[in-house]
């Protein structure tokens, strides 16, 4: 028996196996995926309320700077569904943020008039009560990301994101002013206090707004298995001008991505 005719067959099989292995290697990482993240968000909210005296509004605003420029933070989950093209990735994500709410009360007393002879005086008492809430109800985004393959494990990435956001915010601010006159009757006696005129100004506002905003994403992916990747990322998102409110977030996240 002559084994020579089997050599081309063995050579063909080897080439076919090598080509299949190479193709499998090239296709590694491609396909649909899901990702779950836990994000820490720094939120900056700027409100353009009327100034203390604004003739165009025809009223007095009692909103203090405390509620005009809010800096807060939250921790929230985020889920994504996307497709990996072997370099480029496209994903849709959804997130809900924690509701921010706070209140502030302040009181001040200013002496308006004092009689130097008998010590009688008139004071003005000003009370401010402010209650504010802000809630980024939801964010539905679409991002395009490019992965830089440094080696078989580490893949830094950078990309852009566009998102449709829903925001609710409200403010309830009341300023109450009371003038009080104190009459002294002499040493060892109880003075008489006469409440004077009261004035009260209020500013109330509540909005529910939806707007499309733009942002950027960056991070690094670490392959744990051929299908499982640990993702550490950062994203910046400017939600746009929401009527009289500007809102932007900086987020750091840690999550896992699974490719099917």
Swiss-Prot record:
Principal subcellular localization: membrane
Signal peptide coordinates: 1-23
A Pfam family assignment: Opacity
Molecular function terms from GO: porin activity
Keyword field: Cell outer membrane, Membrane, Signal, Transmembrane, Transmembrane beta strand
Gene for this chain: opaJ
GO cellular component, one term: cell outer membrane
Subcellular location(s) of the protein: Cell outer membrane
Family membership noted in the UniProt record: Belongs to the opacity porin family.
Protein name: Opacity protein opA58
InterPro entries per record: OMP/PagP_b-brl, Opacity, Porin_opacity
Lineage: Bacteria, Pseudomonadati, Pseudomonadota, Betaproteobacteria, Neisseriales
Annotated function: Implicated in a number of adherence functions. OPA proteins are implicated in pathogenesis and are subject to phase variation.
Highest taxon listed in the record's lineage: Bacteria
Protein source organism: Neisseria gonorrhoeae
């Amino acid at each position: 028996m002559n084994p020579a005719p089997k050599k081309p067959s063995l050579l063909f099989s080897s080439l076919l196996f090598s080509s299949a292995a190479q193709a499998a290697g090239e296709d590694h990482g491609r396909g649909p995926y899901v990702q779950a993240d836990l994000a820490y968000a720094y939120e900056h909210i700027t409100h353009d309320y009327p100034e203390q005296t604004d003739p165009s509004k025809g009223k007095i605003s009692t909103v203090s700077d405390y509620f005009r420029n809010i800096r807060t933070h939250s921790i929230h989950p985020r889920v994504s569904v996307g497709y990996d093209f072997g370099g480029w990735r496209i994903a849709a994500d959804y997130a809900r943020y924690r509701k921010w709410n706070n209140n502030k009360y302040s009181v001040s007393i200013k002496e308006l008039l004092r009689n130097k002879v008998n010590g009688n005086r008139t004071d003005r008492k000003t009370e401010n009560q402010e209650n504010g809430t802000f809630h980024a109800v939801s964010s539905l985004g679409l991002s395009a990301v490019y992965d830089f393959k440094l080696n078989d494990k580490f893949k830094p990435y950078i990309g852009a994101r566009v998102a449709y956001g829903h925001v609710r915010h409200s403010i309830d601010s009341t300023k109450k002013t009371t003038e009080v006159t104190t009459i002294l009757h002499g040493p060892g006696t109880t003075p008489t206090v006469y409440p004077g005129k009261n004035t009260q100004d209020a500013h109330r506002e509540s909005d529910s707004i939806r707007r499309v905003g733009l942002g950027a994403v960056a991070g690094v992916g670490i392959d744990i298995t051929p299908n499982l990747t640990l993702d550490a990322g950062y994203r910046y998102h400017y939600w746009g001008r929401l009527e009289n409110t500007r809102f932007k977030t900086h987020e750091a996240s840690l999550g896992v991505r699974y490719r099917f």
